[in-house]
């Protein structure tokens, strides 16, 4: 009850610990649910700059960490401020760049040569990490086995829109969140006020929730709220047949049933 955060954006639950991307404190924090203690794993509250190799987390400055994912003893960090993906080793406490050169662009290739532009959301499925690469309106895919970065959807800083269809023709606009299950990648397509589906098996993008013309603010007291559109959703999580959506500028959590194709608002009692 004494710990403080500053505009945290991403959380990750692993066992009895919750890890927090404490964005404007430029830090990675850990919440121990058993001891009820909060500690800082990496960052010192000051915005950092590019580093070449892993360093002691407590001595390393981060830059706008935005989202987290966990795999094989590492916590991966979408380091939006440095246009990179970083990795924190839970055993050694060291943190440093994992993917991205630090230059802002959309360039595929080996981990150290690839370029991102404000990566803001990450999720892992099998041997792949998916990244919501916001400033280039793209979703990138990191092959963890072969250590290369590929682009699933998107082309560049000035190529954006709301278009469904084949991967090479589809358009997103400043996506901030991503979730994945097998060959299905769900995207919080923030500036399109939509949730999009990237079907890797069919190599196509479709819109699950939201239309370009629907930008109405949702009032939770209005019984018709569930029929209104999303307003700049910033993240999405998949659990079974349900998608949980951070409907940010409506200040709501929404639930989309993939089987029934129904959108509703999460009640507090749930």
Q: Can you annotate each of these PLM segments?
A:
Residues 20-24, 77-81, 131-135, 187-191, ...:
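Conserved beta-strand positions in repeat-built beta-propeller and related beta-rich domains
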Residues 1-9, 37-64, 94-118, 148-176, ...:
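Gly/Pro-rich loop segments of beta-rich domains
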Residues 237-270:
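Blade-level signature of beta-propeller repeat domains, shared across WD40, Kelch, NHL, RCC1
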Residues 15-16, 72-73, 126-127, 182-183, ...:
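Short coil/turn segments that connect the beta-strands within blades of beta-propeller domains
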Residues 32-36, 89-93, 143-147, 199-203, ...:
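Short loop/turn segments that connect beta-strands within beta-propeller blades
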Residues 26-29, 37, 83-86, 137-140, ...:
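A short loop-to-beta-strand structural motif that recurs across blades of beta-propeller domains
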């Amino acid at each position: 009850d004494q710990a403080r955060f500053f505009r945290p954006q991403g959380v990750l639950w692993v066992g009895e610990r919750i890890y927090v991307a404490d964005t404007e404190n430029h830090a990675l924090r850990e919440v121990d649910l058993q001891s009820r203690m909060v500690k800082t794993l990496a960052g010192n509250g000051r915005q950092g700059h590019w580093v070449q190799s892993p360093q002691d987390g407590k001595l390393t400055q981060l830059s706008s960490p935005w989202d987290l994912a966990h795999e094989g003893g590492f916590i991966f960090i979408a380091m939006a401020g440095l246009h990179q993906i970083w990795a924190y080793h839970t055993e050694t406490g060291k943190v440093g760049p994992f993917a991205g050169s630090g230059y802002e662009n959309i360039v595929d290739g080996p981990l150290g040569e690839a370029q991102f532009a404000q990566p803001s959301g990450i999720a892992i499925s099998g041997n792949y990490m998916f990244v919501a690469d916001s400033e280039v309106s793209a979703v990138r895919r990191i092959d963890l086995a072969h250590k290369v970065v590929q682009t699933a959807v998107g082309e560049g800083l000035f190529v954006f829109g709301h278009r469904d269809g084949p991967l090479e023709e589809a358009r997103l606009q400043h996506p901030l969140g991503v979730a994945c299950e097998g060959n299905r990648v769900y995207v919080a397509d923030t500036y399109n006020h939509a949730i999009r589906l990237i079907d890797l098996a069919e190599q196509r993008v479709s819109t699950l929730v939201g239309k370009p013309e629907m930008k109405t603010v949702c009032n939770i007291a209005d019984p018709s709220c569930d029929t209104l559109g999303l307003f700049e959703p910033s993240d999405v999580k998949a659990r079974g047949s349900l998608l949980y959506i951070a409907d940010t500028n409506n200040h709501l959590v929404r639930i989309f049933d993939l089987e029934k194709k129904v959108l509703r608002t999460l009640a507090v009692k749930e």
